[in-house]
């Protein structure tokens, strides 16, 4: 459990602001810094959360880690693979689900629990126990 699964070092991302955005935000700045030299480690088996107010760069950070956008500076290594140099291998190691995703009606919590249990080869007896426990907590 002491293994570093994700190592982020100096991640930076800026976005250009359109003239309309500059006017709305009453700024003359042509760029917005979304992520500014972010570094952290997440260990194998650890539950890790990114917390912060709206606009703090959480989603931008996750998009960089998921190789959906490239960092302007810095790099992250996930499972031994660089998000900058080995994006395809990183995508094979991770899954990324945003709140914007809309699932079909047949993707019920029960269906999704069974699907991911199958995917990760969770034994039937353990699956039943975990499902019962989690469904009691979350409904």
Positions of predicted regions on the chain:
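Short hydrophobic beta-strand immediately N-terminal to the Walker A/P-loop
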Residues: 48-50, 62
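Helix-to-loop junction immediately C-terminal to a conserved catalytic motif
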Residues: 66
């Amino acid at each position: 459990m002491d293994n570093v699964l994700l190592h982020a070092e100096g991640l930076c991302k800026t976005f250009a602001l359109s003239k309309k955005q500059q006017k709305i935000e009453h700024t003359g700045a042509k760029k917005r810094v979304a992520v500014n030299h972010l570094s952290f480690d997440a260990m194998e088996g650890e539950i890790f959360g990114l917390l912060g107010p709206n606009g703090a760069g959480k989603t931008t950070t996750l998009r960089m880690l998921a190789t959906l956008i490239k960092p302007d500076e810095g790099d992250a290594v996930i499972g031994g693979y660089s998000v900058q140099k080995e994006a395809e291998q990183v995508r094979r190691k991770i899954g990324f689900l945003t709140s914007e995703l809309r699932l079909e009606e047949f993707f019920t919590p029960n269906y999704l629990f069974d699907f991911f249990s199958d995917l990760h080869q969770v034994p039937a007896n353990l699956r039943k126990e975990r499902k019962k426990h989690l469904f009691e907590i979350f409904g």
